[in-house]
Every structure is written in structure tokens, then in C-alpha cells.
């Protein structure tokens, strides 16, 4: 009888020389040593196939699957480094491998890991260069729509303008801040977890929070600011207004539904952060 093992598959595509390679290996199914050995194996394979040092862009797609993960879990992200591309792209993979192997809820067995890597020395980077409001006004109405014109400049190429609509919160008062940034830059933290107001209690919740983590290829536009204390016709705030127990997946889903937050996927690594303040 064979000992339990974790299966790894690496699909590596070097765009510059138009060469695709597939490698497979296995590690012992040990929750503590397995991820370390697996990450070292991944690093060795990619380092050998890339066979270069220095700058580059990588598009990664990883998939974790197993007996009690029937649909698996996938994530796609893009990485850019001016000095050490391989080291940069495997940092997130190491973290995810540990989370899946060491999660406190249940063992995923048999566990399989697939990693698709597409690399190039080209700098697939876009910079957020300018943020303007179309048809700018002195004041804005709560619940009103605002058109944002965002100037983006790909590395050493001509700039382009992307228009993104955003909605002022219905209970906004005073001044609101509009923020446009690259995914992962100043990403909101899990405040309810840090404050001890909530805990992740099952694997489904853990996967849900992992799935909403921003990726480096996203443009994030959001608006926030002071809000009226009146809520649902009440003159006084509820305890929920003072202590928000929601997880980030719940908060983000509501903000996206209301139009207060917009995520746009690109094929670039997005750099930059710009702000504007408007009067309500």
C-alpha cells in the first residue's frame, strides 16, 4: 500500500521563447512539512525553467483540490519585479499552501495542487496617472452617480483613459473621499477579526475570505466618508453602527451592490493610488 501523498503539477510557459513545459512531483501528506517541501519543489522547478535572474512579469493561476474540496479553489494573480521575479511570485503561493495544509477545520486529503505560470521579461505594468471627475460639480447628492475618468499609462507606452461609474452613499454627509488604487494597495483589513468581534468558524468561511483578497491586476475605485446617524428611519444609532461584526467578504459584497466600490480586472500589474475629496 502506498503512503498518502500530495500531488503537485507545474505548467510553465515562457512567453519570450514560446516554450511550454509541464512538471509533476509528490510530497508526503504531512500538514506541517508538506507545504515546505512542496514550495521548495515549486521554486526549484520554476527557477530551473526560467533560468534567469532579475526583472519580469508573471501571471499565476493556482488551484487547490481534494476529496472534500469537490469543486476545488482557484486564484489568478499577476506579479512584477524589477529585481527578483521568482521570489516575488512564490511568496503568495507559500502562504496559501500553508493555509490549506494547516487550516484548523479539516484535513484535505488527498490534496492536489496545480500551478500555471506564464512569464515574460516584458514589464506588463500600468500606472494610475490621473484621477478626474467628469462633469465636475461643487456639491453632490447622496445616492447620486459620479463618472470617474482614470488615466492609465502602460510601461513606456501612451496613456489611455478608463471611465468608471461610482455611487455616493445614500446617507453620506459633509465630505466624501474618492480613492482609486491598484489591487492590494491599502486593501481593507479584517477589522472584526482583529478586534475580536468575529471569528472564522468553518472552512467555507475561510475560503470565502481568501477568494475576496484583491489581486495585483485590479483597479479599485471606492468612495467613503461620514454618514448620517439616521438609519432606517431611526434617530439614534444602533450598536451595529458602532461595532461592525461583518467579515470583509460581507462588507465588500454590500459596497459593490450599492455601487460604492468598483473592481476592474486588467491584464497588467497595476501601480498607483490617487484621491479626491468631494462635498455632499
Predicted regions and their residues:
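C-terminal recognition in membrane/secretory proteostasis and scaffolding
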Residues: 1-280
Amino acid at each position: 500500500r502506498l503512503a498518502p501523498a500530495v500531488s503537485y503539477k507545474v505548467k510553465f510557459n515562457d512567453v519570450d521563447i514560446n516554450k511550454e513545459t509541464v512538471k509533476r512531483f509528490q510530497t508526503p501528506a504531512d500538514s506541517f512539512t508538506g507545504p515546505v517541501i512542496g514550495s521548495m519543489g515549486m521554486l526549484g522547478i520554476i527557477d530551473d525553467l526560467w533560468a534567469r535572474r532579475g526583472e519580469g512579469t508573471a501571471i499565476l493561476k493556482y488551484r487547490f483540490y481534494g476529496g472534500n474540496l469537490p469543486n476545488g479553489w482557484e486564484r489568478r494573480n499577476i506579479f512584477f519585479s524589477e529585481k527578483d521575479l521568482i521570489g516575488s511570485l512564490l511568496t503568495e503561493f507559500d502562504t496559501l499552501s500553508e493555509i490549506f495544509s494547516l487550516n484548523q477545520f479539516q484535513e484535505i486529503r488527498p490534496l492536489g495542487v496545480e500551478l500555471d505560470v506564464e512569464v515574460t521579461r516584458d514589464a506588463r505594468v500600468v500606472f494610475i496617472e490621473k484621477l478626474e471627475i467628469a462633469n465636475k460639480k461643487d456639491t453632490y447628492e447622496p445616492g447620486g452617480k459620479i463618472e470617474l475618468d482614470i488615466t492609465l499609462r502602460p510601461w513606456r507606452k501612451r496613456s489611455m483613459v478608463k471611465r468608471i461609474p461610482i455611487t455616493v452613499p445614500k446617507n453620506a454627509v459633509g465630505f466624501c473621499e474618492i480613492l482609486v488604487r491598484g489591487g492590494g494597495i491599502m486593501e481593507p483589513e479584517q477589522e472584526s477579526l482583529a478586534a475580536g468581534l468575529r471569528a472564522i468558524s468553518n472552512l467555507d468561511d475561510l475560503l470565502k475570505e481568501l477568494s475576496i483578497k484583491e489581486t495585483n491586476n485590479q483597479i479599485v475605485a471606492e468612495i467613503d466618508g461620514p454618514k448620517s446617524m439616521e438609519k432606517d428611519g431611526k434617530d439614534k444609532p444602533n450598536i451595529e453602527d458602532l461595532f461592525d461584526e461583518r467579515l470583509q467578504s460581507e462588507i465588500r459584497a454590500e459596497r459593490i451592490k450599492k455601487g460604492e466600490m468598483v473592481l476592474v480586472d486588467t491584464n497588467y500589474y497595476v501601480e498607483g493610488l490617487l484621491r479626491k475629496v468631494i462635498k455632499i
